[in-house]
């Protein structure tokens, strides 16, 4: 599920993936782009990651760790997010329309101008989150 082993690169604050001593960004055997292109992200660990204008539409994000990350202009349209950790993240102008979000931790995160129209959000932790100018209708 979650790896609590730090990346082998001494200056990196991220956690190592479950199949490596490195985080996904520093693993010499992996390129981040092909990994993010898969329709399923399972046990990904990208803490303290800066994600700008990526398209995660229709993906399944399972058991992954993205805490302390920044997401700007990211599309999560029709995405299924299960049992994942987005604690203390910043979400700006992200779209989660028609997504299924279950057993996810968003505690301490900030959401600004995000859309969650017609999304199903259950058993999810938003404790301490700041939600500003977002649309959660439907």
Spell out what each predicted region is:
Residues 1-20, 28-138:
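Tandem repeat scaffolds
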């Amino acid at each position: 599920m979650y790896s609590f082993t730090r990346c082998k690169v001494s200056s990196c604050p991220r956690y190592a993936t479950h199949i490596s001593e490195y985080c996904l960004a520093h693993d010499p055997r992996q390129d981040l782009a092909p990994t993010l292109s898969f329709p399923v992200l399972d046990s990904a660990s990208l803490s303290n990651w800066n994600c700008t204008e990526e398209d995660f539409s229709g993906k399944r994000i399972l058991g992954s760790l993205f805490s302390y990350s920044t997401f700007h202009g990211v599309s999560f349209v029709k995405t299924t997010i299960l049992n994942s950790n987005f604690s203390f993240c910043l979400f700006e102008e992200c779209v989660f329309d028609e997504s299924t979000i279950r057993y996810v931790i968003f505690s301490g995160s900030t959401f600004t101008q995000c859309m969650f129209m017609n999304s199903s959000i259950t058993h999810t932790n938003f404790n301490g989150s700041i939600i500003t100018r977002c649309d959660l209708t439907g």
